[in-house]
């Protein structure tokens, strides 16, 4: 019984306009910053036109990226609401692939911008086996205190024990695939932005992700039992916003790029891997092919890393030992520095920076659920 599973940070699938750039220049789009805008009304009119004009190209490319996964079930991050997801699926994705993702759910999580996690599935796999979404449960309201995960590091950041652990949500989805049980845990962890006190963004925010990762593990162990969790059919999918290794980029297009594999001493998602709790299937690929995101702050700081994960229970990973994931890179912009031999055949109309499918690459894998 096989299921094609994918995860994709679709990057701001919004149904709202953001006019924050009128009062905060740091939030203003670079295209609008070229022009003299006299008042807020004029700014809002221009921002609407800019957003709508770019969105059509962007969502065609996002749909192409999802279509390329050939997935039966897709986990999404950064979705505004169910209306936005329905409009995207019908207006863009359905027109490309026909047989639609009829079952959809969008979480109402804790993100301050209102970007949530979502799941959509077909009614049956591409091989004709029924997919039943039996239940969907949110863990957005779980606090540090409830799971005993509050630490001195979190307190130093101003986070109290009574506060919610997940910055978005951990969505628990119970499925039957051809009569076989399968549980999906979908998450989008705290971003690595916002360094303070002399620390970079990744290091400063790491305690939050450590707690989120530990909470996901605790939720799974509480559900299946600590001793039995390894034997059950489950997967963790999503943008976990941290990496355990990366490809550091040096050089330039004139003298040639150099790519160095670097393994990190610690990561915010380490609790998920301690004692072999789960298996990162992307690590079945060669080291320099595991990346799902290109990060840059100019020539002095560039790397490729994995932020997007499909993590399988040990039993499920063992039953799929011979399978490897696919990372869809055709939607990446031309500014992404890609190692030799990995250059994708990009989708039509991809730009240097935009339009693009997303800043993230979808990850997909066929899994035998037995």
Segments from the language model and where they lie:
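Extended recognition/assembly regions associated with phosphoester-bond processing machinery
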Residues: 31-34, 45-57, 81-87, 93, ...
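Metal-dependent phosphoester-hydrolase catalytic domains
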Residues: 1-4, 82, 218-235, 240-370
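Active-site flanking residues adjacent to catalytic metal/cofactor-binding acidic residues
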Residues: 8, 77, 187, 238-239
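Short secondary-structure boundary/capping segments
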Residues: 20-24, 89-93, 200, 249-259
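Metal-dependent phosphoester/phosphodiester hydrolase catalytic core
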Residues: 19, 167, 175-185, 189-218, ...
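N-terminal, active-site-proximal structural segment of metallo-dependent hydrolase catalytic domains
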Residues: 1-96, 105-116, 159-161, 368-370
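Structured beta-strand-rich core segments of catalytic domains in phosphoester-bond hydrolases
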Residues: 2, 73, 79-190
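Extracytoplasmic/secreted cell-surface and envelope-processing proteins
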Residues: 84, 113, 193-195, 243-247
């Amino acid at each position: 019984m096989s299921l094609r599973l994918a995860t994709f940070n679709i990057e701001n699938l919004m149904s709202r306009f953001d006019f924050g750039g009128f009062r905060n220049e740091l939030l203003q789009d670079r295209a609008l910053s070229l022009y003299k805008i006299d008042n807020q009304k004029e700014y809002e009119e221009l921002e609407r036109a800019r957003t709508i004009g770019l969105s059509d190209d962007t969502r065609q490319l996002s749909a192409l990226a999802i279509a390329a996964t050939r997935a039966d079930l897709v986990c999404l991050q950064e979705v505004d609401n169910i209306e936005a997801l329905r409009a995207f699926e019908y207006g863009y994705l359905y027109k490309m692939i026909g047989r639609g993702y009829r079952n959809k759910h969008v979480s109402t999580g804790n993100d301050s911008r209102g970007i949530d996690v979502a799941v959509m599935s077909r009614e049956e796999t591409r091989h004709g086996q029924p997919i039943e979404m039996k239940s969907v449960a949110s863990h957005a309201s779980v606090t540090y205190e409830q799971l005993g995960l509050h630490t001195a590091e979190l307190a130093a950041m101003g986070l109290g024990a009574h506060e919610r652990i997940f910055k978005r949500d951990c969505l628990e989805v119970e499925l039957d695939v051809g009569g076989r049980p399968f549980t999906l845990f979908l998450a989008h962890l705290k971003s690595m932005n916002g360094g303070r006190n002399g620390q970079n963004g990744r290091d400063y925010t790491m305690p939050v992700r450590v707690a989120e990762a530990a909470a996901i593990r605790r939720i799974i162990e509480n559900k299946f039992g600590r001793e039995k969790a390894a034997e059950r059919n489950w997967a963790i999918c999503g943008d976990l916003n941290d990496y355990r290794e990366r490809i550091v980029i040096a050089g330039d297009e004139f003298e040639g790029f150099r790519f160095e594999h670097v393994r990190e001493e610690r990561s915010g998602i380490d609790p998920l891997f301690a004692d072999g709790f789960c298996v990162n299937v992307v690590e079945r690929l060669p080291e320099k092919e595991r990346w799902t995101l290109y990060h840059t702050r100019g020539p002095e700081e560039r790397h490729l890393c994995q932020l997007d994960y499909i993590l399988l229970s040990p039993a499920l990973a063992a039953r799929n030992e011979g399978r490897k994931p696919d990372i869809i890179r055709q939607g990446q912009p031309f500014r992404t520095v890609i190692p030799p031999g990995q250059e994708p055949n990009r989708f039509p109309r991809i730009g240097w920076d935009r339009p693009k499918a997303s800043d993230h690459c979808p990850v997909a894998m066929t899994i035998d659920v037995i």
